[in-house]
Amino acid sequence: MNAMQPPQSIEEIKAGLETTEKGGVRQSIRNCLTVFQCDPLLSGAIAYNILTDRKDIIKPIGFHRESTALNDTDMKYLLLYLEETYGLTNEKKIDNAIGIVANENKYHPIRDYLNTRVWDGTERIRFCLRHFLGADADDYTYEALKLFLLGAISRAFQPGCKFEIMLCLVGGQGAGKSTFFRLLAVRDEWFSDDLRKLDDDNVYRKLQGHWIIEMSEMMATANAKSIEEIKSFLSRQKEVYKIPYETHPADRPRQCVFGGTSNALDFLPLDRSGNRRFIPVMVYPEQAEVHILEDEAASRAYIEQMWAEAMEIYRSGRFKLAFSSAMQRYLKEHQRDFMPEDTKAGMIQAYLDKYTGSMVCSKQLYKEALNHAFDEPKQWEIREINEIMNQSIDRWRYFPNPRMFSEYGRQKGWERENPATDSGNPSEKTMDGFVEVTEQMELPF
């Protein structure tokens, strides 16, 4: 079948329709299809929008319309037109024909937009967040925004592809963070900030038809439990959902990416294992070159060229939807600036800085570093110490085979990577084994 057959005159179409034995027009899907494919008004008018998962009317068809999506009022006009012009009155057959012709005339508005951008050769991704929001113009900020843009492009062209990163813009109220995400979506209907609950059975409806989705309220009230829920939500590649008028549920691959905004600096709950899905960028509106709404047309033109630049990278295929190993290490350190202070890690680090031995165990750290001399650690407290040593403390290497500790028996633990020497005053040795010389110390020569 070809949904885009050359239009014919109404009389030619009528002459080609199937008829009943009595000479009347047959109420068949085939006849309805012929009309939608060949009628000069309706040919090419109905299409399936891959982004919204809906049928659209994409050209004028003789009556005023407010949006492209096919709605109940449109159906009434179409039924009237087919009845008066061709004598076709079976609503179910007409609806089935609309479904077929739309399915054979698919389009994706974001793909069409991206494919028609032409880059002028001027680099903008590297400087965009500095330009609009006053962020640092460093490699991290560049890689963060580039990764987010490529993730958005990939989700448009390859729905459901693995991309579980959230770009988080952090800074004072009024900086333009939410506006940045809205303009980044190009069209307002491709943007949403209406995602409130992640466990809603109808969450697909909140994602449907949108490309850039901002999470603001959830990030503002995030705690350890909700962050885990957000992580799990970001890792999904599809929703399974049954549209009300359909019979069976279907997989709905994701075509959107998620951005976060927060006015609070310490918006990430303490997580020593890392929050690799969250990429925070600090913004300083007083350092911005322009406010993003100062000249909205100019801002949109800048963003359009930025998408064109990102498409050049996408077409080249020379990218990964993940940070490099070096940037991952930087991210892990950088994220600590956006978490509450880890007081227990600080106490353990202070203890180890003065400790002169070459190995420690978790029980020792519980009693001596965390000041529980007369208590026995619970299992969760041991796990917490292990996590601190493995994730937050440098220069100590874990050993899995138990060794003998004079006060704690045989224990697994950690050994110093660069053991201190035994000479001099042990309490004042530095991490590399040297003794710091103060002004009060008398030199022995």
Predicted regions and their residues:
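P-loop NTPase catalytic core of nucleic-acid-dependent motor ATPases
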Residues: 98-208
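AAA+/SF3 P-loop NTPase mechanochemical coupling elements
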Residues: 203-208, 243-261
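N-terminal nucleic-acid engagement/recognition segments and initiation subdomains in replication
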Residues: 1-124, 143, 375-376, 380, ...
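Conserved AAA+/SF3 P-loop NTPase catalytic/coupling segment centered on the Walker-B
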Residues: 212-234, 269-274
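Conserved alpha/beta core segments of nucleic-acid transaction machinery
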Residues: 313-357
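Conserved catalytic/switch belt of AAA+ P-loop NTPases
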Residues: 227-247
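A short helix-turn-beta junction within AAA+ P-loop NTPase domains corresponding to the substrate/partner-engaging
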Residues: 270-288
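DNA-recognition alpha helix
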Residues: 362-374
